[in-house]
Amino acid sequence: MLKKLLFLFLYLAASCFLYGQQFQISSVDYEILPISPKSHFKTDDYQIAKEIPVNTKKVFSSEEDLFKYLDDYRQKLKNLRAFEEETIEINYEYSEPVTTSTLNNQGQPLTITFVTLHIKAQDAHHLVIIPGPKYNSNSGLTLKIKLKDTNFLGTLQTLRSDFYVMIPTSESDADNFETGINFAYDYPFQLGIFDALWINDLGISYTSGNNLPEFGISTGLRLELPFEKTKLIFEATQSFANNLGFQKYNDTFYFTDTFKISAPIVLADLNYFGKLNYTPYFNSTFYWDFNGINKNNISLASPIITGGHSLSFGRKDWNKNLRTGLSVSLDNYYSYNFKTKIFSPVVKLDTQAYKSFDLFDNKYTLNSFGICANLNTFTYLTKPSDDPFTLQHQGIGIGGQLRGIRDTQYYEGTGMSALSPTSAIILNLDFPIHILSTYFTKTFLKYLNFDMQLSPFIDIALCYNKITKEYFNPKDGFYAAGLEAIVYLHRWSSTAIRGSVGIDVGRKFFPNMLNMEWRDGVSKKEFSLGLELHY
C-alpha cells in the first residue's frame, strides 16, 4: 500500500512539473555530408538557415508541439530537393530545465527546457551534364549539351549553362540554323550587414545568314538588409546587347540600366502556409546607346518607372515526387514610360494549388496520383480600345503558358500578337499519375533509378481580343489539351525530364464554336522536351 501511495505521489509531482514545463530552441548546428568524400563542396550552413530559418524565439507549450514543429521542419528540408531524403535527421538535446519568475495560467512558475538541434543530411546529386535535346514546334529541334547544377558550390543557387544548335524543321516557325551558348548564375555572399547576390547572365548566338552574332551580357548586385519583420532589398543591373532586330533603327548595340528597391513586410504568420508578405516596390529601366535610341524604336523607349505593391503567401510539400500545397500572389503596379507618355496600371493574380493522393500500396507502380492547377489572371486598368498605342504595342505574353497553342500567332492580316493580350485568364490543369519506379542495386544501374509519371493536361486562356474588342468571350478563347511524360531521377531529386505533346483542340475539333475570322493559320499541335516542370 505504501509503495502505491509513493508511486501516486511521484506521478502527480511529475505531471505537475511537466504541465508547467515549456520548450524553446536555443541553438542549431548542421552536419551536411558532401556527395562523396572526394567532393570539395557541400551545402553551406548559412544558406540553409537563411532559406528555412529555425524559430528560436517561439516557446512551445508542450513536447508534443515541439515534435510537430520538428516534423514540419524536416518536411521543409525535403522541399528544398537538395538532400537525399532518407538521410535527413533532426536530433535534439535538452538542457536542464530553467524555472522562470513568469507564472502560467494556473499560477505555477513557467519552466523552460532549452533545446539544441543537430541537423544531419547528405547532399543529393545536383550536377547534370547531359545531352539535352529539345523539340519545340515554335523554334524547331535544338541539339543541346546542357549543364545544370541546382546547388552550385553549396549555395542552393542554380547554375545553368548550355551549348546548342537549333535546326529548323517543317513543323517549326524558324527558317535558319542557329548556334549559341548561355550561362546564368547568381552567387550569394555576405557583404558586411547585407546578404548580397552577384547576378550574372550571358548569352551569345549566331544565326546563319547574319554577318554578326547576337549577344546579351548582364551583371548586377542585389543587397538585402534584414530586420525582424521586414527587409530592404536593393538591386542594380546593367546589360549590354547586340540585337540585329534593331538594325533598321541603328540601335543594334545598346545598354540597359535597371534599379529596383523593395521592402517585404511580414503581416501575419499563416502557420502551415508560412508568412503573409506585403511588398511595396519601385523599379526603373533606362535604355541607351552612344548615338541615342531611335525615337521610332518603341521596344527601347525609356525611361520607364514602375511602382507597385503585392501580397503573397504559399508553400508546397513534396512527397513521392508529387506536390501538395497552395501559393497565392496578388500584384498591382503602375508603370509610366516618359518617352511614349503611356501610363499602364496593371493588376495580376497568380495562384497555384497541388494535391497528391495515395493509390495502391506498391512501390513499383500506380502508388499515387496528383491534381495540379495553375491560375494566372491579369488586366490593364485602362481601356485598350481608347488608346491605339496600347492596342498595338502593350500586353503580356502568354504563349509559353499554353501547351498546344503556337507562341507565334498574330491576328490575321495584322502585326499584332494574338498571345500578348492586355487582359487574360489562363488556367492549367494537370493530372500526374505514377506509372513506374525502378530500384536497381548494381553499381552502375543504381544511378539510373527513376520514377515515371504520365500527366494528362488541359490549358485554357480567355483574353481581351484586340480585333473584336471583347473581354473573355469563350468564342475568342484558346483551348488546348495533351499529355506529358515526366521522369524523376532518384539521385538527382531536383531534376525532372519532361516531354509534352499538346493539341489546339479548339481549332482542330470545334472550329464551328469559335470565332475563326481573326485566327492565324498556324499548326494545331506543339511538342516540347526539356528538363523542368511546366510550373
Segments and roles (model prediction):
Residues 21-138, 146, 160-189, 203-207, ...:
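Periplasmic polypeptide-binding modules associated with outer-membrane biogenesis and secretion
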Residues 278-460, 464-474, 499, 509-535:
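C-terminal outer-membrane beta-barrel translocator/porin domains of Gram-negative envelope proteins
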Residues 133, 145-149, 181-187, 217-225, ...:
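Residues on the lipid-exposed face of transmembrane beta-strands in outer-membrane beta-barrel proteins
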Residues 126-129, 152-160, 190-199, 226-235, ...:
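Repeated loop/turn-to-beta-strand initiation elements of outer-membrane beta-barrel proteins
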Residues 174-296:
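Transmembrane beta-barrel wall of Gram-negative outer-membrane proteins
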Residues 4-14:
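Sec-dependent N-terminal signal peptides
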Residues 125-137, 143-145, 149, 156-173, ...:
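Transmembrane beta-strand segments that form the barrel wall of outer-membrane beta-barrel proteins
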Residues 169-176, 192, 201-215, 236-257, ...:
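Outer-membrane beta-barrel translocator/channel fold
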